[in-house]
Amino acid sequence: MIYSKVFLKLHWGFSVVKPLAAKAKPGFYLPPPTTLIGALSYGKFRGVDNINLGNVYGSPAYNFRNIMATARLESEGVYTEDIIRNVISYFQRKERRENPRYIYGVIPTGKVYIPNGRLVVVYVTDSISKEELEKLCWSITRIGCKECLASVENVEVGEAKKVSGRVKTRYYFRDTVKVVGRKEFLEYVTFWEENGYIWGKEGSPVRYILPITTYPLASKEVEVEAKEAYEVGGEYVVFS
């Protein structure tokens, strides 16, 4: 297995809306794995919105579904919900959709503000080469929606050493992993798995634990009992 650790500087922050959000759009404190993989795929599929996946169509990010991804904050941030003018016509009854009064609405949208702050993303895989992984990492331009610009400051690539047992981590992990010791900095969230890349299909919900404080937003170290973890440049990422 190989890994890449990507050090990103966020221009203002990021916004990734929670699954099934509609009139209200709360956001995540950290971008989920599917978002991170989507950001990675941009370097190879820039300008391609969908691809043929046999008898269905979907996001090009589906080709990288075998890559494991996680993230942590390197800087402190703040979560807020801004008032945004959004299209809401597709939530209206059919007879209302042509009425200009019901085209737009004022929607509270979750955002993490962290101007010039740093986000660290780790990818672990054995499905692509080191050279391709590093190239794709340097090609990341945003995290989340298209306005969430990011600059890659550095990319570290190396061999991911598989370990198990008790390790300490600041990266998020699935809630099936047992946390030992202090548990006051844990936030439980529901992400989607990779079927969310397929048009017309809903990704199955997957529960994760974020070791983070909510105000200010800051990643914290926790100790866990891991079945599958990897040492990546002096840190540990946990996947089961």
Curated annotation (Swiss-Prot):
Keyword Nucleotide-binding carried by entry: no
CDD domains the UniProt entry points to: Cas5_I-A (cd09753)
Gene Ontology molecular function, alphabetical: RNA binding
BP-aspect Gene Ontology terms: defense response to virus
InterPro entries linked: CRISPR-assoc_prot_Cas5_N, CRISPR-assoc_prot_Cas5a-typ, CRISPR_Cas5_sf
Top-rank taxon, per record: Archaea
Note in the entry: Cloning was done with strain P2, while interaction experiments were done with genes cloned from strain P2 but over-expressed in P1. The aCascade complex was purified from strain P1.
Quaternary organization: Part of the aCascade ribonucleoprotein complex, minimally composed of Csa2 and Cas5a, which binds crRNA. Other possible components of aCascade in strain P1 are Cas6b (SSO1437) and Csa5 (SSO1443), while SSO1399, Cas5b (SSO1400) and SSO1401 have sometimes been seen weakly associated. Csa2 is probably the major RNA-binding subunit. The Csa2-Cas5a-crRNA complex also binds target DNA homologous to crRNA, probably forming an R-loop. Purified aCascade forms a filament about 6 nm in width.
Family statement drawn from the similarity comment of this UniProt entry: Belongs to the CRISPR-associated protein Cas5 family. Subtype I-A/Apern subfamily.
Function of the molecule: CRISPR (clustered regularly interspaced short palindromic repeat) is an adaptive immune system that provides protection against mobile genetic elements (viruses, transposable elements and conjugative plasmids). CRISPR clusters contain spacers, sequences complementary to antecedent mobile elements, and target invading nucleic acids. CRISPR clusters are transcribed and processed into CRISPR RNA (crRNA).
Name under which the protein is recorded: CRISPR system aCascade subunit Cas5 1
Source species of the chain: Saccharolobus solfataricus (strain ATCC 35092 / DSM 1617 / JCM 11322 / P2)
